[in-house]
């Protein structure tokens, strides 16, 4: 005996609940597929790319600006490298260079003044104190705030600020000759307290550095601060003097054969070393590890180096023909550079193409990947609809 129920032809097929549910599920799927471009997850480079300028209240773009796309070739690489070199190789002001003419005394310095064969002057200099602090002045003659120093048997203050110890020695000897026969005087600095420079940023030991008889050059200041930290961007060093900031590209100076030790610092100068993380390049899209990539220690970064830091292109989802570099130029006008990395030879261009601060490197996905992602969104809805239709059949 046949256990199946006979097919009821009295009810039109399109009025049966199970059929209606199944059709509804397929209708939803078809509508979603028709709008696949709008619901596809992830990003995709439009053709042609455009930047929204104005939008309406409901979010629709009312006007846009077409962004030019330039193909990366050897001529373009050479052009960009020349432009960047002209910027990074900007001359350092001549005022920063110089030679040391010897230490010049200043207010706060402590002098040790010895008059030979006259021990009575030793008491005037004072005796060392026990349990002294590092900030305490050493025993001796302190140069006053007006730049003068007092010494026994000399009726007038000796002008010391702006002079070398040997010049002060000669002046004291000349005055003491009025009282003693052929006095022999020695003047040395017991404590350097007149001037400091300040080093901050990406050095191992930021802080103030006292200027002494060793010329305070840029290199000396960095070395006293423990040297550049691994995070330092040696292309972005700034000297601030009297309210004016002077950028110094230390890496470029060395490449050009200019010794940074010829840059002389003055009392009150601020030396700041920028961090590499302050000027990153953003790598996103179909790469294995999307990341914010800092430049190298010399401030440079190429396209191939950035992709390498991001784990290279994702071989399953990336379209190697669609690698883009998005950049905002000096006039705030955006530009997009395109490189086809399908051929390994194009890696030579990527290895030479220089990136700039805040560039965005974007690797597009393939059309199949976009379709697959849309289907992955729709399959759960379709399956649920079909299951519901079968259950209620």
Q: Where in the sequence are the language-model features?
A:
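Amphipathic, non-transmembrane alpha-helical segments in extracytoplasmic/periplasmic proteins
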Residues: 109-117, 146, 164-180, 199, ...
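N-terminal, post-cleavage mature segments of outer-membrane
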Residues: 2-7, 12-13, 37-174, 245, ...
């Amino acid at each position: 005996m046949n256990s199946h129920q006979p097919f009821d032809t009295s009810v039109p097929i399109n009025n049966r609940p199970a059929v209606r549910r199944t059709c509804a599920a397929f209708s939803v799927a078809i509508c979603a597929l028709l709008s696949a471009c709008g619901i596809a997850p992830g990003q995709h480079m439009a053709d042609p790319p455009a930047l929204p300028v104005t939008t309406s209240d409901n979010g629709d773009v009312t006007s846009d600006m077409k962004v030019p796309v330039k193909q990366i070739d050897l001529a373009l690489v050479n052009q960009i490298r020349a432009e960047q070199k002209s910027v990074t190789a900007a001359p350092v002001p001549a005022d920063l260079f110089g030679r040391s003419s010897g230490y010049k005394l200043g207010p706060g310095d402590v002098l040790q003044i010895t008059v030979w064969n006259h021990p009575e002057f030793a008491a005037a200099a004072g005796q060392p104190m026990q349990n002294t602090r590092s900030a305490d002045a050493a025993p001796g003659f302190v140069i006053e705030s007006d730049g003068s120093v007092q010494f026994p048997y000399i009726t007038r203050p000796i002008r010391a600020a702006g002079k070398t110890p040997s010049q002060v020695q000669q002046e004291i000897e000349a005055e003491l000759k009025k009282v003693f026969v052929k006095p022999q005087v020695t003047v040395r600095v017991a404590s350097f307290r007149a001037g400091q420079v300040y080093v901050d940023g990406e050095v191992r030991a930021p802080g103030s550095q006292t200027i002494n008889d060793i010329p305070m050059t840029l290199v000396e200041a960095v070395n006293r601060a423990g040297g550049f930290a691994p995070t330092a961007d040696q292309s972005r060093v700034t000297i601030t003097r009297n309210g004016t900031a002077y950028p110094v590209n230390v890496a470029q100076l060395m490449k050009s054969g200019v010794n940074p030790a010829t840059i002389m610092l003055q009392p009150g100068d601020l030396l700041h070393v920028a961090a590499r993380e302050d000027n990153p390049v953003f790598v996103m899209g179909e790469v294995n590890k999307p990341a914010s990539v800092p430049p190298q220690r010399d401030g440079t970064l190429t396209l191939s180096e950035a992709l390498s830091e991001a784990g290279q292109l994702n071989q399953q989802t990336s379209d190697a023909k669609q690698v883009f570099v998005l950049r905002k130029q000096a006039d705030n006008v955006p530009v997009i550079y395109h490189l086809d990395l399908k051929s390994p030879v194009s890696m030579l261009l990527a290895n030479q193409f220089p990136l700039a601060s805040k560039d965005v490197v974007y690797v597009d996905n393939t059309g199949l990947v976009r379709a697959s992602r849309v289907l992955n969104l729709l399959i759960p809805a379709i399956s649920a609809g079909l299951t519901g239709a079968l259950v209620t059949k």
